[in-house]
Amino acid sequence: FVINVGRGSTCLSRLSEWGDTVGLIPKGQSPLIGVDISSTAVKLLQLSRVGNRFRVDHYAVEPLPPNAVVEKNIVEVEAVGEAIRRAVTRAGSKAKYAAAAVAGSAVITKIIPMPAELDDNDLEAQVELEAVNYIPYPIEEVNLDFEVLGPMPGNPEMVQVLLAASRSENVELRESALEL
């Protein structure tokens, strides 16, 4: 997910709005910090595009206190938020946006077929309707995202859609830590 760093921030629902085929660093976009939250440290990286290559503009590693993150789950949001703040200061980044991933073990992914003729709004609505068949949690308790992967092999009338879902609490804890 992507979040505006600082007060009044809003989580953007679709990472794909940020990217071209490379993903998170489209030409002319505002800088974006990548934040990795492990059980021992917060790692921060800001890249920029130079032609067809990437350059490291800012980076930092900030240790976390013991048990702030346990088994990839944030236990102490304030401690993680403070570590992120220290890492941003140490790195010297002025970026206003950050992206952080939810641990793979906390994410459900499925490739689902969808009719190719659906426009973006209809596709989003259909994915939300179909998600209940693939997600073992109440749909109101998860954050969903999806990306069209391309045509279904052997059936050009259908597309393959990658559905990703995580319990909302997993996303909200990271969002809270980034907002501090």
Regions found by a protein language model. Give the residues of each.
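N-terminal phosphate-binding loop and adjacent alpha-helix
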Residues: 59-89
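Gly/Thr-rich phosphate-binding beta-strand-loop-beta motif of the actin/hexokinase/Hsp70
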Residues: 15-63, 96-103
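Active-site neighborhood for divalent-cation/phosphate handling
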Residues: 97, 101-180
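Residue-identity detector for glycine
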Residues: 6-8
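Switch/connector loops and helix/strand junctions flanking conserved nucleotide-binding motifs
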Residues: 54, 70-72, 107-111
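Conserved, well-folded catalytic cores of nucleic-acid-processing
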Residues: 50-51, 87-91, 134-138, 180
